[in-house]
UniProtKB/Swiss-Prot annotation:
It comes from Chloroflexus aurantiacus (strain ATCC 29366 / DSM 635 / J-10-fl). The lineage of its organism: Bacteria, Bacillati, Chloroflexota, Chloroflexia, Chloroflexales. It is an enzyme of class 6 (ligase). This is DNA ligase. Its cofactor is Mg(2+); Mn(2+). PROSITE patterns: BRCT, DNA_LIGASE_N1. Residues 683-694 have a biased composition (Pro residues). It catalyses: NAD(+) + (deoxyribonucleotide)n-3'-hydroxyl + 5'-phospho-(deoxyribonucleotide)m = (deoxyribonucleotide)n+m + AMP + beta-nicotinamide D-nucleotide. Residues 602-691 form the BRCT domain. It comes from the Bacteria. Residues 679-709 are annotated as: Disordered. The gene is ligA.
Length: 709
């Protein structure tokens, strides 16, 4: 690449980055993904490193970024609010450590303070003589915006400070500083964000794309009363200017901030062994979905302030800190088309067809659009650049459009009025978001999905039958209802491509074995609305046979523990339909078992009266095994978290259920906690207060003695 070409590319990169900075920092409306932005910045740094004569003072690599909006008064930060360099791999982290050790010298003893990197809005809070006098956003790192009135409305930000200490904190100052600038992150918990969006949607107002945008948009309101109504929170992570006291390390600073009354992330740790730092990063990357807030990485800082000063700052990045970035969970790509799928209950769901995009190491080509209201509220159009999110085991979904990238070619999309599979008019019940095809008996798309569900592992578990086989058998007219599965013949299957003698024999044997599945599995397979594994086992345990369940009145069903009015009404409605009763008789004629339950026999009443919700992946128990274990010891398992929930059992990649439990103050336990409850009638506190700092044999402090929030 010629010198002129390099200069042109550098100017192009700077222009792009400035534009993206403006949208991200000033408008709070990012138009590219973090991964795209990081790639541009990495390229610019590499080109400038190779051609230092082209570096200019106004390059994005030489200053922080952004320009404050004009609607708030500007605030000059007494010390720059620096950004952090990024590490994406273990090799990047080791390279950073090696640079630090090389600069500090071979005899340096280094400790590291690490914590999850919250995806919120950075602010600086200035206190004089213990009183909050000013609060400002980060802005461009040099100049921010005065949002004092709005920050005062956040309950977790103290308006006055009071120094306290305990014997274990004998290294902390016992007096208040004359001036202290506390830096931290304003954020919104995931559950609070979802509740806020629901409220805004119900009022017909614009909703937010993600918790960070919600926090930023809420904090930058001209009317503080609007901010006060938003569920904002604050975590302190450091200080700027400090006068009147002396602080010597990041670890001491965090404990002092906690003593002053600031919430500090309880997951902060201090290590002297860098291997522990690497393990911490790997652990949080694996369980990032366990957090009740959005986190996009881990921040690592050199603990000792004297070492920080010795290491200094290069351009916009301090040498003494780095951010380990998690793989992206969001990306921006183009929405090529919107199609619809018809489910087994007739619900018609819109689906986004996307330009393929990598998210967290997976190529995403399709994503959920949830329902018609979701599309309308976000004004999602075909041809839009859209934000796509993939988190944990959640199906990828479209967050919303990037309005700033529209060029006028985008087309609004209209939800169909008729079923794409059978042509029946779509209907929507009052109070529901879903449109349905109610042509239950004839719609081929619904039949395919019902067959898939009927043969699934949680139902009749027919090995060798799945989506492709269901579509083929329905298309060929071999299956007109799920009972027809049991009347398939070898000569019919032999006419189908790919079905040889061995495959036919295996499939027919699997179908024959399915006749003997317990009744609760058949109930699940029938697809009765609201009747899942636990409800089916409860029904069979209480009533014993399918005939008894079919004959039960709604009032009788409601008397069964765990079967409420909604579930009871759904069961009565299902069995009142002549087509469904005819299906049952056809299954009976096919020799399908109509009694028995697959759940465990009652072993004890240890968990009697307690209600559990399961979320995430447990270390050794499957979801079904954990549910069966709870039921066997007298407990009840439900699908949703409420104030009536006794415990939430959380494993890896727990999602919104965990967040809601934390919001409601529901006790959260892991698999070991569940087993402990079953083994004893005592109820150990699921979230004990943190003990004083412990030290392992390497001298690593394992737990910051902070309660957080």
């Amino acid at each position: 690449m010629s010198h002129t070409t390099v200069a042109d590319r550098i100017n192009e990169l700077r222009s792009l980055i400035r534009r993206y900075d403006y949208h991200y920092y000033v408008l709070d409306d990012p138009i590219v993904s973090d991964a795209e932005y990081d790639a541009l910045m990495t390229e610019l740094r590499a080109l400038e490193a190779a051609h230092p004569e082209l570096i200019t003072p106004d390059s994005p690599t030489q200053r922080v970024s952004g320009t404050p909006a004009s609607q708030f008064a500007k605030v000059q930060h007494p010390q720059p609010m620096l950004s952090l360099g990024n590490a994406f791999t273990k090799a990047d982290l080791l390279a950073w450590r090696d640079r630090v050790l090389r600069l500090l010298g071979p005899d340096a003893i280094v400790a590291y303070v690490v914590e999850p990197k919250i995806d919120g809005l950075a602010v600086a809070l200035t206190y004089r003589d213990g009183r909050l006098v000013q609060g400002a956003t980060r802005g461009d790192g040099e100049v921010g915006e005065d949002v004092t009135a709005n920050l005062r409305t956040i309950g977790s930000i103290p308006l006055t400070l009071q120094a306290t200490s305990t014997p274990q904190d004998d290294d902390l100052p016992t007096t208040l500083p004359t001036t202290i600038e506390v830096r931290g992150e304003v954020y919104m918990r995931t559950a609070d964000f979802e509740t806020l969006n629901d409220r805004l949607a119900a009022a017909g107002e614009k909703i937010f794309a993600n918790p960070r945008n919600a926090a930023a948009g809420s904090l930058r309101q001209k009317d503080p009363t609007i901010t006060a109504a938003r569920p904002l929170r604050f975590f302190a992570y450091g200080v700027g200017v400090v006068e009147g006291i002396s602080l010597s390390s990041q670890w001491q600073t965090l404990r002092y901030l906690r003593a002053l009354g600031f919430p500090v992330n309880q997951d902060v740790r201090r290590f002297t062994d860098f291997a522990e730092v690497l393990a911490y990063c790997e652990a949080w990357m694996a369980k990032r979905d366990d957090l009740p807030y959005e986190a996009d990485g881990v921040v690592i800082k050199i603990d000792d302030f004297a070492q920080q000063r010795e290491l200094g700052v290069v351009g916009r990045d301090p040498r003494w800190a780095i951010a380990f970035k998690f793989p992206a969970r969001e990306a921006i790509t183009r929405l090529l088309d919107i199609t619809v799928n018809v489910g087994r209950t007739g619900v018609v769901t819109p689906n986004a067809e996307l330009e393929p995009v990598q998210i967290g190491g997976v190529t995403v080509r399709n994503a959920s659009l949830h329902n018609a209201d979701y599309i309308a509220q976000r004004d999602i159009r075909i041809g839009d650049y859209v934000i796509v999110k993939r988190a944990g085991d959640v199906i990828p979904y479209v967050v919303g459009p990037v309005i700033a990238r529209r060029d006028g070619s985008e087309r609004p999309w209209q939800f169909p009025t008729h079923c794409p599979a059978c042509g029946s008019p779509l209907e929507r019940e009052e109070g529901e978001a879903a449109w349905r095809c109610n042509n239950f008996s004839i719609c081929p798309a619904q039949l395919v999905r019902r067959v898939e569900h009927f043969v699934s592992r949680s139902a009749l578990d027919i090995v060798g039958m799945g989506e492709r086989q269901a579509e083929l058998f329905v298309q060929r007219g071999l299956i007109r209802d799920v009972a027809d599965i049991f009347f398939l013949k070898a000569d019919q299957l032999a006419e189908l491509e790919g079905f040889g003698p061995k495959r036919i024999a295996n499939l027919l044997a699997a179908i024959d074995a399915a006749r003997q599945r317990p009744l609760d599995r058949l109930l699940v397979g029938l697809g009765i609305r609201y009747v899942g594994t636990v409800a089916a086992q409860t029904l069979v345990a209480a009533l014993g046979s399918l005939d008894a369940i079919m004959a039960a009145r709604q009032e009788e069903l409601e008397q069964i523990p765990g079967i409420g009015p909604v579930v009871a009404a759904s069961i009565v409605d299902f069995f009142s339909r002549p087509a469904n009763r005819a299906l049952i008789e056809k299954l009976r004629a096919a020799g399908v078992q109509m009694g028995g339950v697959s759940g465990p026999t009652r072993q004890s009443d240890t968990l009697a009266g307690k209600t559990f919700v399961l979320t995430g992946t447990l270390p050794s128990l499957s979801r079904e095994q954990a549910s069966a274990l709870i039921v066997a010891h007298g407990g009840k398992v439900t699908d949703s978290v409420s104030k009536k929930t006794s415990y939430v059992v959380a494993g890896a990649n727990a999602g919104s259920k965990l967040a809601k439990a934390l919001q409601l103050g529901i006790p959260v336990i892991d698999e070991a906690g569940l087993l402990a409850l079953i083994g004893t009638t005592a109820e150990p506190p699921p979230s004990p207060p943190p003990p004083p700092p412990e030290t392992n044999t390497d001298g690593n402090q394992l737990l910051l003695p902070l309660d957080g929030e």
